[in-house]
């Protein structure tokens, strides 16, 4: 895996409050190597280790993107939903930013069926077929389409399982993480001081509740993805 310089600035991370962990009483002892100190009953994350992990993750996604692999970004907590959609769209990644439907990956054949239904309904809407149906039936199909758009819109172009997943909150996305582990899909995940870093391939110690913190981490990762894709197209 190639190593590059990603301009990860500790002061910028401080300003984004990446270093702020949870209350000390909520901590997971496995996060001890990533904790710098505690202040007012709150754990403070060691940003030097955050920078090291983030740089490693950027190197990985850069290489994978350069090989044309597919990414899935997951973040359904309210602080992350808009950030995930924006970052994933910019980097041409698949994403889930609403409810994670159980079995979305482990029961891929069912997901494929749902995606085909989504595609068919969208085509019917775009061609005006809904307008030719009785109002009650058209309304029912429109509701189905809206639901599919809400939960599957971010993966509508996903034709197979992703090659790697980026997860913004380990505890909130435990089902998604579990499915990735079951299938052997590599994971990059923000881990706050109440998380278990052993559950992911590349843990990035960081505040997983703050919008600025999530945005900074996602921006660095998706920038690396975009650079990898650009290099591949040369």
Curated annotation (Swiss-Prot):
Location of the protein in the cell: Plastid, Chloroplast
Statement: the UniProt record of this protein carries the keyword Glycoprotein: no
PANTHER family reported in the protein's UniProt record: 30S RIBOSOMAL PROTEIN S2 PROKARYOTIC AND ORGANELLAR, SMALL RIBOSOMAL SUBUNIT PROTEIN US2M
GO terms of molecular function: structural constituent of ribosome
Protein name as catalogued: Small ribosomal subunit protein uS2c
Domain of life of the organism encoding this protein: Eukaryota
NCBIfam families: rpsB_bact
GO biological process, one term: translation
The organism of origin for this protein: Pinus koraiensis
Keywords on record: Chloroplast, Plastid, Ribonucleoprotein, Ribosomal protein
Record family assignment: Belongs to the universal ribosomal protein uS2 family.
GO annotation, cellular component aspect: chloroplast; mitochondrial small ribosomal subunit
Chief subcellular location: plastid
Listed SUPFAM superfamilies: Ribosomal protein S2 (SSF52313)
The keyword Zinc belongs to this UniProt entry's keyword annotation: no
């Amino acid at each position: 895996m190639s190593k590059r310089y990603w301009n990860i600035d500790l002061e910028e991370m401080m300003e984004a409050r990446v270093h702020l962990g949870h209350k000390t009483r909520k901590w997971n002892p496995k996060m001890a190597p990533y904790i710098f100190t505690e202040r007012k009953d709150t754990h403070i994350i060691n940003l030097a280790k955050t920078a090291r992990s983030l740089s490693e993750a950027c190197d990985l996604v850069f290489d994978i993107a350069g090989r044309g692999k597919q990414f899935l970004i997951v973040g359904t907590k309210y602080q992350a939903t808009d950030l995930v959609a924006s970052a994933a769209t910019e980097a041409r990644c698949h994403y889930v930013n609403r409810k994670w439907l159980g079995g979305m990956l482990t029961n891929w054949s069912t997901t494929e069926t749902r995606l085909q239904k989504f595609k068919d309904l969208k085509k019917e809407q775009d061609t005006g077929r809904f307008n030719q149906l009785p109002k009650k039936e058209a309304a029912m199909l429109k509701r189905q389409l809206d639901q599919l758009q809400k939960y599957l819109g971010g993966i509508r172009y996903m034709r197979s399982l992703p090659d790697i997943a980026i997860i913004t909150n380990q505890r909130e996305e435990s089902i998604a993480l579990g499915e990735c582990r079951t299938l052997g899909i590599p994971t990059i995940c923000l881990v706050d001081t109440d998380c278990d870093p052993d559950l992911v391939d590349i843990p990035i110690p960081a505040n997983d509740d703050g919008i600025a913190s999530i945005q900074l981490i996602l921006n660095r990762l998706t920038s690396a993805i975009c650079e990898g894709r650009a290099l591949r197209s040369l």
